Amino acid sequence: MEGLVYKSTGSWYVVKDIATGAAYDCRIKGRFRLKGIKNTNPIAVGDRVTFEVEEGTKGIITEIKPRDNYIIRRSVNLSKQTHIIASNIDLAFLVVTLNNPLTSTTFIDRFLVTAEAYGIKTILLFNKIDTYNAEEIDEVKFLAQLYRQAGYECIGISAATGKNIAKVMTAMEGKTCVVSGHSGSGKSTLINAIDPELHLKTAAISEQHLQGQHTTTFAEMFDLPNGARIIDTPGIRGFGMVEIEKEELTDYFPEFFALKHHCKFHNCLHTDEPQCAIKEALEEGTIAWSRYKSYLQILNGEERDN
């Protein structure tokens, strides 16, 4: 039977039969698990799989179909292992907040580079705009302009009040979408605003650490009335980069890619080389210094997100 993975708990997977929509609790066939996969999760939400029904609503996954794409990051404290956040994605939403918790530009850029590398369109959602003062609203506008200049769509939203949620729903129509961001950024509140019938758990920010409490432990996909599917993911504190070669990195910063052919050297890394179009654009102010800083950190293999 052909199915789609809707939920992963690490050892069990909820798989929906593509033909009937019936849900089955499946596990991985033993030998299939031991193929030397270095991911912490060999099967991800969004995967297309072949499975066999054992009894009732229990089943065994026997094959993963080739993935169109996926979003991947290095696992926490397990530098040799990776974690696939979700697969077969049409559109990613990154939920950004100025504070409680702070989403740094470095974190945003790491996520965007990974999405670019796998051909996944990303929209930045600046959440909680109903809670910001005038100075903070100006900062949101500045950041949104910075990322629009780099080629990204940005929407200011309030998941709590419903502001601009209709815009988000229009963008999602008929697509498989993933919602990502830090714990406490409002991902589950956003999904509840999109479809109140889902009743996803939400939690307040920890006052002591100003970080979100994890309310989503495992990734899970939901069907929406507008023909879309939305994947809710656990909050991410750090975003370790994987699988990107130094020579390719420029290609995943759209505003760098547009200029790289004007560099004197075809293999220019935009660090110390003469007549570099990217560094000239930096001096002219057409490329943001924060983006260049993120580029250098990723290029040099630095793992910090600030």
Regions inferred by a protein language model and the residue ranges of each:
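Conserved beta-strand/loop subsegment of P-loop NTPase cores
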Residues: N88-V96, G119-I129, A150-G156
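N-terminal accessory targeting/assembly segments
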Residues: M1-T105
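Catalytic P-loop NTPase motifs of RecA-like helicase/translocase cores
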Residues: L102, Y132, K163, R237-G240
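Histidine-anchored nucleotide/phosphate-binding helix
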Residues: T106-K121
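Helix-rich effector regions associated with P-loop NTPase G domains
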Residues: S11, K38-E55, K65-I85, K121-T122, ...
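Canonical P-loop GTPase G-domain recognition
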Residues: T131-S185
